Amino acid sequence: MTADEGEARSEIVYGVQGGVSMKWVAISNPGRVRLTNEDGALTGPGMFLLADGMGGHDAGEVASAAALEALAEVFGPEPAEAQVVMEQVVDRLRDAHAAIEAIDSETGKRAGTTVTGLLLTTYEGVPHWLVVNIGDSRTYRLAEGYFEQLTVDHSQVQELINGGFLSPEQARVDPRRNVITRALGAGMEPDADFWIVPAQPHEKLLVCSDGLNGELTDDEIRQILDSDVPIDECADQLVAAALNAGGRDNVTVIVVDATTEQTDPDW
């Protein structure tokens, strides 16, 4: 399978919201093994969300779509206070969880999905990202030379890492690495984690399904994200690297370049 077969992608999109200038691109590829793509992405000025469905056949695809459809209702023309947006997201996730559980009862399949990403909000009048996560999809940030995973995986191996029983390197090859502990649907707890982080003068943000970080190390991801190429090429390189490493799962990436109005975006 080439990088173009079955691939969905956006062109570079530009937007300004709440004093932050943004450009972004999203790519979703089924990978080299899976016949269907159960990932989904939702993007707009100040809203960058991803869902990785599970359940086989069309159940996972329906689950991820249901989550993103519910979360789309949170979008507004200007950023709202972080606490208000958080409460809205919790309500929408609850609605999505109920809808996905109904998929189980109608089809007999245990549908579920992860959700991760960022929404631009304000905190004490200053632009902040509200980061949300449930499951093992990830949100990263590269700013001022510092690369960090903003989210924490809800997975068995992450719990073992936290308990000191596995190293991150061991977790990458552990047979339990794909077992998640939270999701929307799938008979799991739908409790999301949230973080409120200040928007930086210039930052690159990456939202991805585990089809990316399951194939590439954080160092490999950082090297590509830190390269001096347009963000569409950066996204292409991330997906291509995951496919070249095996492409055993669907691979979806959202790459965002964000700059506050106090600095020159130099686009």
Descriptions of predicted regions:
Residues 2-267:
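PP2C/PPM-type serine/threonine phosphatase catalytic domain
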